[in-house]
């Protein structure tokens, strides 16, 4: 049997991390079994579904490289198919027309609740033989079995049972002729030959209804697996107050897709004590029986740790392709300065996100208007003039501009003046970067370049002279 899974988001907003994890689990299960992964857009909610949301979902899937083998299919383009199946069910007697008014249904609901009963349709039209005009408004309901129970073996939670007496006669077509969500899902899974449905636990109550409809259609019933929800680190349902929840917001915040995927796969699944997984390892090791039944807690610090790992573990040339977007957001012209791959090597240890890297690299490419006030006050003082003049001259004398030779020039300055490296290094760092913090000074000066470094040292000397004149 060929394994076939699907990810079926409703395009009413962005792709959130819960949906992304569900998509990842479905994708991994299919890839692990050499099967196929289908993308289906469940856009039957015409009022809330938007083209922007569809685009956001696609962007998130593409950024995570969760490629699909079929689709995207759109439910709104399959209404004729759904209605044809409903008409077939009406003929076979597994569905019926319901003419009950909203007023009657509301009165029935209130009466049942007053008695402490669970609100449900009483089946009046199921057993009615009244004649109605063809154009009289009605809904179509599924004739749910009235006896027995629905049992399915959830691949994560184990056997789950629902009594048919607890299930309503579900509306499968509205008065406007549009099919309902639960019915469309059934026909789609049938037509698309989905073998395994992996989705959130909020769909558990839909499952017995969908199984009954599939059986009424004499269609194969897929295997179901319901993934637990994701909570914030405070144990409450994950929401914006816990930080970003949109996949693309993590892109915007400077995370690599590899880091988010690695974090999401471990958010409810484990393979021994292993924490770091390549995409290939995820595919090789992923199984549903290793997915936890318990809710997971989203920990941003753990994700940040993973992101820092991947910034330094992945090839710098690859990381640079993602960094480019953030550089563009900062409007930095990188034509005069180090290659972005070299920048990744320079800043990788210091920066935990690509956004942080982009925001802290401008001095490599563009001159700054002024020095950081605190750093200048502390390090660009008259006592720094001589070390800066000497190191400037030694840097200017370098014919082979390498980080090693830059280091020798700084060390030689300290030796000549018989001062510690800090007496040379800190004024030099502020002079060439404009701030008090940077990567190792030799590689920083080397990356900034000989001409620009000397110009900035001269600017720092002018700054010191100006301060002296003001005193």
From Swiss-Prot:
A Pfam family annotated for this chain is: tRNA-synt_1c
Q: Which family does it belong to?
A: Belongs to the class-I aminoacyl-tRNA synthetase family. Glutamate--tRNA ligase type 1 subfamily.
Q: What does this protein do?
A: Catalyzes the attachment of glutamate to tRNA(Glu) in a two-step reaction: glutamate is first activated by ATP to form Glu-AMP and then transferred to the acceptor end of tRNA(Glu).
EC nos = 6.1.1.17
> Tell me, which GO biological process terms does this entry list?
glutamyl-tRNA aminoacylation
* Gene expressing this chain: gltX
User: Where along the sequence does the record place the motif called 'HIGH' region?
Assistant: 9-19
Q: What is this protein called?
A: Glutamate--tRNA ligase
Q: Which is one Gene Ontology cellular component term of this protein?
A: cytosol
Task: Identify the residues that bind ATP.
Answer: 240
Reaction catalysed by this enzyme: tRNA(Glu) + L-glutamate + ATP = L-glutamyl-tRNA(Glu) + AMP + diphosphate
Query: Quaternary structure per UniProt?
Result: Monomer.
Name the top EC class.
Answer: ligase
Per the Swiss-Prot or TrEMBL annotation, the motif 'KMSKS' region is positioned at 237-241
């Amino acid at each position: 049997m060929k394994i076939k899974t699907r990810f079926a988001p409703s395009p009413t907003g962005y792709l959130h991390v819960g949906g992304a994890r569900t998509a990842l689990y479905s994708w991994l299960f299919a890839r692990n079994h050499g099967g196929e992964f289908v993308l289906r857009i469940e856009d039957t909610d015409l009022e809330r579904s938007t083209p922007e949301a569809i685009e956001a979902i696609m962007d998130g899937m593409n950024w995570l490289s969760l490629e699909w083998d079929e689709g995207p299919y759109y439910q709104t383009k399959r209404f004729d198919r759904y209605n044809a199946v409903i008409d077939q069910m009406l003929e076979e007697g597994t569905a019926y027309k319901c003419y009950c008014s909203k007023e009657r249904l509301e009165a029935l609901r209130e009466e049942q609740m007053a008695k402490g009963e669970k609100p449900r349709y009483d089946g009046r039209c199921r057993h009615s033989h009244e004649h109605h005009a063809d154009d009289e408004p009605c809904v179509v309901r599924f004739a749910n079995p009235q006896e027995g129970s629905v049992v399915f073996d959830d691949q994560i939670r184990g056997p789950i049972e629902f009594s048919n007496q607890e299930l309503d006669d579900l509306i499968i077509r509205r008065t406007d002729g549009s099919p309902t969500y639960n019915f469309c899902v059934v026909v789609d899974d049938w037509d698309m030959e989905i073998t395994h449905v992996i989705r959130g636990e909020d769909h558990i109550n839909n499952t017995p209804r969908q199984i009954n409809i599939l059986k009424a259609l004499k269609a194969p019933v897929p295997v179901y697996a319901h993934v637990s929800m994701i909570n914030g680190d405070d144990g409450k349902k994950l929401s914006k107050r816990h930080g970003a929840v949109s996949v693309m917001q993590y892109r915007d915040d400077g995370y690599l897709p590899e880091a988010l995927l690695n974090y999401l796969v471990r958010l409810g699944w484990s393979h021994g004590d292993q924490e770091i997984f390549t995409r290939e390892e995820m595919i090789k090791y992923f199984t549903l029986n290793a997915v936890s039944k318990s809710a997971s807690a989203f920990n941003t610090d753990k994700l940040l740790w993973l992101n820092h790992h991947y910034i330094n573990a992945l090839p710098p040339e690859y990381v640079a392709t993602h960094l480019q977007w953030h550089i563009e957001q900062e409007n930095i012209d990188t034509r005069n300065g180090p290659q972005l791959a070299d920048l990744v090597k320079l800043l990788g240890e210091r920066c935990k996100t690509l956004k942080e890297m982009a925001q802290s690299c401008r001095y490599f490419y563009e001159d700054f208007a002024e020095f950081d006030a605190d750093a200048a006050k502390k390090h660009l003082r008259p006592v720094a003039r001589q070390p800066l003049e000497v190191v400037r001259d030694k840097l200017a004398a370098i014919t082979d501009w390498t980080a090693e030779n830059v280091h020798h020039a700084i060390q030689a300055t300290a030796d000549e003046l018989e001062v510690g490296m800090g007496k040379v290094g800190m004024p030099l760092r502020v002079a060439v970067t404009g701030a008090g913090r940077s990567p190792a000074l030799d590689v920083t000066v080397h990356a900034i370049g000989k001409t620009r470094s000397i110009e900035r040292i001269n600017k720092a000397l002018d700054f010191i002279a100006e301060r002296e004149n003001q005193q």
